[in-house]
C-alpha cells in the first residue's frame, strides 16, 4: 500500500504536532515495512527535524515541483497536491494535523485526518467567524 502524509509539521515543528507526526511515520514504517510512505511537505524545513524520521527504504520526502507550486506552497498543500497524489497512484492520504487537500474524494483518494483539538466546538465565541468556518 502506498500511503501519503501531509508532512509539513514533520519538517517545520519541533514539538507538539511535529512530534506526533514523526512518531506516526516512524512507528508505521517500523511496524509495517512492506508499505510505501511518501511524506509531502511544501519545503525542506529544518534538516534536524527531517533527520528525526528514521531512514528506511520505504520512506521518502516529496516537495512541490512546479514553479507555481514552489511560489505558492500553501496553495499547493490545499489543492495542487491532489493532482500529484493521483499521478503517484496513492492508496491513502493521512492528514496529520487537522486538514486534508481539497478534492481527494472526487479523485478517488481515500483519506484519514487526525483532529487534535475540538475546543472551537465547545467555545466558538473564542474564535473569529472565519476561523470557525475553516475548522468546521
Regions found by a protein language model. Give the residues of each.
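Carbohydrate transferase catalytic cores enriched for Leloir-type hexosyltransferases
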Residues: 1-136
